[in-house]
UniProtKB/Swiss-Prot annotation:
One of its GO terms (cellular component) is ciliary transition fiber. Belongs to the CEP83 family. This is Centrosomal protein of 83 kDa. It comes from the Eukaryota. It comes from Mus musculus (Mouse). It is found in: Cytoplasm, Cytoskeleton, Microtubule organizing center, Centrosome, Centriole. Component of the distal appendage region of the centriole involved in the initiation of primary cilium assembly. May collaborate with IFT20 in the trafficking of ciliary membrane proteins from the Golgi complex to the cilium during the initiation of primary cilium assembly. One of its GO terms (biological process) is cilium assembly. PANTHER family: CENTROSOMAL PROTEIN OF 83 KDA, NY-REN-58 ANTIGEN. The modification Phosphoserine is found at S689. Residues 32-625, 656-689 form a coiled coil. Keywords: Cilium biogenesis/degradation, Coiled coil, Cytoplasm, Cytoskeleton, Phosphoprotein. Interacts with CEP164 and IFT20.
Length: 692
């Protein structure tokens, strides 16, 4: 509004100004407006270009941040790999330390070797002692059984002799008594009435039936005796089997003892091999110790080289950091001087520059404080830049509004607007240049700050690595000293172990010699015992063979006797049958004679026949009663002739004499049966004693 008086003359009369001048002024004003429009369009295009450049710069910032993150991740991976390698090396060192033999481990190895060497030998000696005690117990048991059986045999022998003598005395007394009875019977028969012969015949028939029953009972007893004989043979076979089994067991024990001797020899050889293997293991451990010493020396040289390289890298990094700091300070001073020299009209650009400075200061502080919060700050910067972009767009819209208002005002203030527009154009061009320069400087500052941050991080990481390496170097030096000390100790222990191994070898050789001596002594004892056992076995076999021969002889004799007895029994049965038939004929003849008168010739013939029958009957009785004695006729033909007075009269004995004779015969048969039983028992006892 203040510029209007300068446009019009002071007189104030519009009539004085002609119309063509006014039209010219309007034309000029229109030209200026068009020129302003063209400028506005150019500014708009420039604004779009600046926005695109801003977007590009943001994209570049993102890319740079991504590259920074990738580089950080790579460095972290490298650090982790290096740490893993250090951990593995530390583990290897610990393993080597564990593999190194300490005096305690050597003592444990010694104890284990002693246990492994002594335990099987102790067990072997213990088993041998147990077997020796077991064999002694068995030998004592067999000796006790032998003495017991011997005493029983002697006792049975004495009893047998006593019983045999008693039975001999009995038999002698009975024979004497029987002879007396025989004489008495002979006298009685001479004094007996011949009329009682018929009763005597009946009594003889009864006796015959009784004798047949006795024969049957005797046959049953003979069958029982056969069964007993078979049982005795089975017992003898069982005894023989038991002896064979005992022989096999003794042979098996001898074989087992020989096998144990061989196993003891093999065990001694195995112990020698184990000693050789232990010596080889000691040599291997010594070689491993030398290798460990070499590796430790190589590791120490590598550690020294790493120390030197780290020192050089640290010095290089320090120099580069000092150069970067000086360059950054110079650039900051330049930027501050350039920012101070900017015009006061462009307040928007100043506010953005101040805001960027504040952001840079905050970014520097936050990077110094927190290295790990770089990502968050980058995102915050992006948000701040987006906010700034919005603010710039709002300000540009405000500027456009102001331009519209100014266009309205410029219609009245043409000259002032032209001057201001020119000044603003110049200022805008200068501002654009300054903005471009500031943007380039900001980008350089951002890159420099990122480089500085990277360098700081690398410096911190390198410092940490250096500290870790120093710790490792100290630990390695300590481990080297420990290993050297342990090597000296190990050498001493190896020498001691060698001496102990020599002592152990000498002790083992002595023990082996002692064991061999004991084994030889035991072998000699076992051979003596074996020889004794063989002698005992041969004696037993001889006794057994003798007993077997005796049994066979007795069996053959028994068979012969049995066959003889059977033949005699058959003959006697035939004779008895013949006598029965003759007796029946005589009875019929007697009946006929009793019914009719018999002539003298027939009577004499019948009398002779009766005498013959009586003689045969007496022979049969004598054979039954005393089979070994020759048959004797107790009644002579003269006695019979004198005894016979009446023809047709029956021959008979008194009843009390018949009963006594029958009882005597029964007693004789019982005695004979008892004698057979005693003889068979004696034979069985004789067979049983050598079998046992």
């Amino acid at each position: 509004m203040d510029t209007f008086p300068s446009l019009f003359p002071p007189g104030g009369d519009s009539r004085l100004n002609p119309e063509p001048e006014f039209q010219n002024m309007l034309i000029d004003e229109r030209v200026r407006c068009e020129h302003h429009k063209h400028n506005y369009q150019a500014l708009k295009i420039e604004h779009k270009r600046l926005q695109e450049e801003y977007v590009k710069s943001q994209n570049e910032l993102k890319r740079v941040l991504i590259e920074k993150q990738a580089s950080q991740e790579k460095f972290q991976l490298l650090l982790e790999d290096l740490r893993g390698e250090l951990v593995e090396k530390a583990r290897d060192i610990e393993k080597m330390k564990l593999q190194v033999l300490t005096p305690q481990k050597l003592e444990l190895v010694k104890a284990q070797l002693q246990q492994e060497l002594e335990a099987p030998m102790r067990e072997r000696f213990r088993t041998l002692d147990e077997e020796v005690e077991r064999y002694r117990a068995e030998y004592n048991k067999l000796r006790y059984e032998y003495t017991f059986l011997k005493s029983e045999f002697e006792h049975q022998k004495e009893e047998f002799t006593r019983v045999s003598e008693e039975e001999k005395m009995k038999y002698k007394s009975e024979v004497a008594r029987l002879e007396k009875d025989k004489e008495e019977l002979h006298n009685q028969l001479l004094s007996v009435d011949p009329t009682r012969d018929s009763k005597r015949m009946e009594q003889l028939v009864r006796e015959k039936t009784h004798l047949l029953q006795k024969l049957k009972s005797l046959e049953a007893e003979v069958a029982e005796l056969r069964a007993e004989k078979e049982n005795s043979g089975a017992q003898v076979e069982n005894v023989q089997r038991i002896q064979v089994r005992q022989l096999a067991e003794m042979q098996a024990t001898l074989r087992s003892l020989e096998a144990e001797k061989q196993s003891a020899k093999l065990q001694a050889e195995r112990l020698e091999k184990e000693l050789q293997s232990s010596n080889e293991q000691n040599t291997c451990l010594i070689s491993k110790l030398h290798r460990a010493d070499r590796e430790i020396s190589t590791l120490a040289s590598e550690v020294k080289e790493l120390k030197h390289a780290n020192k050089l890298e640290i010095t290089d990094i320090k120099l580069e950091a000092a150069r970067a700091k000086s360059e950054l300070e110079r650039e900051r001073n330049k930027i501050q001087s350039e920012l101070d020299g900017l015009q006061s009209d462009n307040e928007i650009l100043k506010s953005t520059v101040e805001h960027h400075k504040a952001l840079l200061v905050e970014k520097d502080r936050e990077l110094i404080r927190k290295v790990q919060a770089a990502k968050e700050e980058g995102y915050q910067k992006l948000m701040v830049l987006q906010d700034e972009k919005l603010e710039l767009e709002n300000r540009l819209s405000d500027l456009e509004k102001m331009k519209v208002e100014r266009d309205v005002w410029r219609q009245s203030e043409k000259e002032q607007c032209e001057e201001k527009l020119r000044a603003s154009q110049m200022a805008e061009e200068a501002a654009r240049r300054e903005l471009q320069s500031t943007r380039l400087k900001l980008q350089q500052q951002i890159v420099n700050t990122e480089k500085a941050e990277k360098e700081k991080l690398e410096n911190s990481e390198l410092k940490q690595q250096i500290s870790h390496l120093q710790i490792q170097v100290t630990s390695l030096t300590q481990s080297e000293n420990d290993l050297l000390n342990s090597n000296h100790m190990l050498k001493d222990m190896v020498e001691r172990l060698k001496q102990e191994c020599r002592n152990l070898r000498s002790q083992a050789e002595k023990a082996q010699l002692d064991v061999e001596k004991t084994l030889e002594e035991k072998q000699i004892q076992w051979l003596e015992e074996k020889h004794k056992l063989h002698e005992r076995i041969t004696d037993r076999e001889e006794k057994y063979n003798q007993a077997k021969e005796k049994l066979q002889r007795a069996a053959t004799a028994q068979k012969k006797r049995k066959s003889l007895h059977e033949n005699k029994l058959k003959r006697l049965q035939e004779k008895v049958e013949v006598l029965e038939a003759k007796k029946e004929e005589l009875e019929t003849e007697n009946q006929v004679l009793n019914r009719q008168n018999v002539p003298f010739e027939e009577y004499t013939r019948l009398q002779k026949r009766l005498k013959d029958i009586q003689r045969r009957h007496n022979e049969f009785r004598s054979l039954i009663l005393v089979p070994n004695m020759p048959p004797t006729a107790s009644i002579s033909p003269a006695n019979f002739q004198s005894a016979v007075t009446v023809p047709g009269a029956e021959l008979s004995f008194p009843p009390h004499l018949q009963e006594e004779q029958h009882q005597r015969e029964l007693s004789l048969l019982r005695k004979r049966l008892e004698e057979l039983e005693t003889t068979q028992r004696k034979q069985l006892e004789e067979l049983g004693s050598p079998g046992e």
